[in-house]
């Protein structure tokens, strides 16, 4: 049993390693959100788990030789019932990302330089100019609250309308509107806007990573459990038949 337990850990270790490497490379080369990378992740993780399951069936503790039928079955069922269903749900309900993007994601973004980027936007000079001619006390109080608690603003930023023009300049209309609402009319440098955009993308990428790591671990456990309990189609009996005296 202990040896079979060690074999079960093989899938978990490989999946977690793949998941971490995938998201590191994703943020490096394709940080934007979308469906393309999600489909690629599901397909690649399925192929890797299938290869691992085929390998596990070839071991003496299970079938003694590669059993493609049970390996495919043990991989398709959890990936279709859990992985694909969750991926579709996450696309339909993007608000689920907030659970981790505003916790783990925010921590990663601050380590990436989010605080320094926000400091460049909310400069003392910019704030002074914005408030100089204002006499509305309630407005100034609200602005002071936003200036001192930037996390709330960061959590509400929308990046769905971001695009880069033919000059490579970032165009972010919703954020520009937010700055005007905050009476910050000074022009923000392109490099600062891009840094902020990638900080927000990092928040989302970390959230996707945590979600897919958790749902992937569940899928791998279900897959491995199915593999070891279904029996082999290439030979009668197996390790679990002997252990539980099944005939």
Predicted regions and their residues:
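Membrane-proximal, non-transmembrane alpha-helical segments
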Residues: 152-213, 220-221, 228-240
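Compact beta-rich and alpha/beta scaffold cores in large eukaryotic transport/transcription complexes
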Residues: 245-247
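N-terminal first transmembrane alpha-helix
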Residues: 1-109, 199-216, 223-237, 241
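Charge-rich cytosolic interhelical loops and cytosolic tails of multi-pass membrane proteins
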Residues: 81-190
């Amino acid at each position: 049993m202990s040896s079979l337990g060690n074999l079960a850990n093989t899938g978990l270790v490989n999946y977690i390693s793949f998941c971490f490497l995938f998201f590191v490379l994703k943020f490096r080369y394709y940080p934007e959100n979308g469906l393309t990378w999600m489909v690629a992740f599901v397909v690649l993780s399925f192929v890797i788990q299938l290869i691992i399951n085929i390998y596990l069936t070839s071991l003496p503790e299970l079938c003694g030789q590669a059993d493609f039928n049970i390996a495919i079955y043990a991989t398709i069922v959890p990936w279709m019932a859990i992985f694909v269903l969750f991926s579709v749900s996450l696309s339909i309900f993007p608000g689920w990302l907030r659970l981790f993007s505003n916790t783990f994601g925010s921590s990663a973004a601050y380590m990436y330089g989010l605080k320094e980027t926000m400091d460049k936007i909310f400069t003392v000079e910019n704030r002074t100019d914005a408030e100089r001619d204002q006499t509305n006390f309630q407005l100034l109080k609200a602005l002071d609250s936003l200036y001192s608690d930037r996390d709330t603003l960061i959590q509400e930023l929308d990046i769905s309308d971001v695009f880069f023009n033919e000059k490579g300049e970032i165009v972010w209309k919703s954020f520009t509107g937010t700055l005007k609402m905050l009476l910050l009319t000074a022009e923000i440098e392109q490099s600062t806007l891009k840094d902020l955009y990638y900080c927000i993308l990092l928040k989302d990428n970390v959230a996707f990573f945590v979600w897919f790591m958790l749902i992937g671990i569940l899928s791998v456990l279900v897959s491995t459990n199915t593999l070891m309990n279904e029996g082999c189609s290439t030979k009668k009996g197996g390790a679990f038949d002997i252990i539980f005296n099944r005939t």
